[in-house]
Amino acid sequence: GICISDEVQVGGGRVGKSFWGFQAHNVIPDIITIGKPLGNGHPIGAVICKKEIAESFANGMEFFNTFGGNPVSCSIALQVIKTVKRKKLQKNAKLVGNYFKNELIKLAFRAHLINL
């Protein structure tokens, strides 16, 4: 089988504990898809895969993307990654995430609408 990790929602330090969501599960995916966190609102995406999978595209099948390799988008993605690291946004995501989780747990005990 093939393991695919879709990092569109959880990638780029958003889970706090690790930079990529799959790292929290101690797996190494065959394919990783990255989108929204990479461009912080600017349209960009990426697919990262193991060498064997990439080589399977060398059989003559062509892939075309209108905006593929756009230098502006690539520059923005690089700056987003640098900003996340420089401003320690992954650490902040962990702090805010823990706070939010704890507040939801408190709410669950006060309001009988949430079942834990």
Locations of regions flagged by a protein language model:
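Conserved N-terminal phosphate-binding loop of PLP-dependent enzymes in the Aspartate aminotransferase
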Residues: 1-116
